[in-house]
């Protein structure tokens, strides 16, 4: 049985890519199937990363022609015409040439539409286009319609669907009437701890990286690692900073980092207009090691997002022993709530109140210690590999019926 792991994107694309990268490394470490598992990548920069790691991979380079063909295959009459003249999508030709029996998509990918008779597994991280459709990122350029079409295809044709939380599973069942046995829950496992452990012998590197930003060391630094999407709700922190400014409370500094996903200029201009430069700093893009330096040297992490339920910074904060302020009630019926500083994102004043936790060092120490132990429990790499090995075993058994 030959398996292809489809890793789409490159390191510049942020958290989703690194989540997929970590998953791909763990999949390659499943001993029983390792000789039969190959990595499929789509960007040259990703190829360079794996070359340094001496990990073999196959490059399926996405380009404008492929994107145009993908659009043509979306249109009924052009799809029928292409079929008549026996033109297949390049991705289908690629996977057939490589003789894959199964493709593992580490995130929802348009390429899954072109697998045809080749079986596939797909990860789906969230269904926020359904639950938070009011945000522009779910509506611009027909994003909602495209996602709906893709998710209907995945939920109909995928051999298995992997989601990060039980509430994601419930959403899939409710929205798309998926057989519950088809959906596997596998928690996020972040990549940053792996990168940190590889460099751990050089701890001074991280201090030097952090110090180059010349942030005031007399302030409590709270880190928000998130792309500038509207649903990430940076505005909530701006509103809280306004309250702190009115109270002349200058103890706190919020640091934003992330790529522009349409909301960067709005947030940047608001900070300038409200003269909050003393309370909020922005770094549009940080390297992996710079992000780690902020996790190590900040006093906490914040994520007032509307979308989830879970997000990578939760587990990164747990690993690096930092408290995290997180949206209240976003993660239903889960013990993880005992490890979060829950904030009411309808009330910026609530965040200001919750910041008082920094006056209780004993409570802080207990929280971060408990969170680290919880991380080891729920982000267990062996559990991840066991879950995927069960899926591969099940498919291998079925494949043996005809091959």
Where are these regions (language model features)?
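Carbohydrate transferase catalytic cores enriched for Leloir-type hexosyltransferases
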Residues: 1-403
């Amino acid at each position: 049985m030959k398996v292809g792991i489809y890793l789409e994107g490159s390191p510049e694309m942020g958290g989703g890519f690194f989540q997929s990268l970590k998953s791909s490394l763990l999949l390659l470490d499943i001993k029983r199937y390792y000789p039969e598992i190959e990595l499929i990548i789509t960007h040259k920069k990703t190829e360079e990363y794996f070359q340094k790691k001496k990990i073999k991979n196959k490059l399926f380079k996405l380009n404008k022609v492929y994107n145009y063909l993908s659009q043509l295959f979306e249109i009924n009459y052009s799809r029928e015409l292409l079929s008549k003249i026996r033109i297949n999508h390049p991705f289908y030709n690629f996977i057939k040439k490589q003789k894959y029996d199964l493709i593992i998509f580490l995130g929802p990918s348009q390429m899954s539409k072109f697998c045809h008779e080749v079986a596939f597994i797909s990860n789906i991280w969230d269904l926020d286009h359904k639950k938070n459709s009011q945000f522009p990122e779910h509506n611009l350029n027909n994003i909602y319609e495209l996602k709906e079409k893709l998710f209907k295809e995945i939920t109909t044709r995928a051999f298995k669907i992997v989601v990060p939380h039980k509430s994601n599973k419930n959403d899939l069942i409710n929205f798309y009437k998926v057989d519950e046995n088809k959906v596997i829950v596998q928690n996020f496992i972040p990549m940053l701890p792996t990168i940190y452990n590889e460099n751990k012998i050089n701890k001074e590197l991280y201090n030097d990286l952090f110090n180059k930003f010349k942030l005031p060391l007399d302030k409590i630094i709270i880190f928000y690692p998130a792309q500038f999407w509207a649903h990430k709700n940076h505005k909530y922190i701006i509103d809280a900073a306004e309250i702190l400014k009115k109270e002349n409370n200058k103890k706190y500094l919020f640091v934003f980092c992330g790529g522009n996903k349409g909301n960067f200029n709005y947030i940047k201009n608001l900070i300038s207009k409200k003269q909050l430069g003393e309370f909020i700093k922005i770094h549009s893009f940080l390297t992996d090691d710079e992000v780690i330096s902020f996790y190590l040297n900040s006093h906490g992490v914040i994520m007032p997002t509307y979308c989830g339920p879970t997000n990578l910074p939760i587990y990164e904060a747990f690993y690096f022993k930092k408290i995290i302020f997180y949206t209240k009630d976003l993660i239903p019926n889960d013990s993880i709530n005992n490890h979060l500083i829950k904030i009411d994102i309808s009330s910026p004043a609530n965040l200001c109140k919750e910041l008082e936790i920094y006056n209780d060092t004993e409570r802080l120490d207990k929280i971060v210690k408990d969170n680290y132990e919880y991380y080891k429990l729920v982000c267990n790499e062996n559990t991840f590999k066991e879950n995927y090995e069960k899926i591969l075993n099940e498919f291998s058994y079925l494949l043996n019926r005809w091959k």
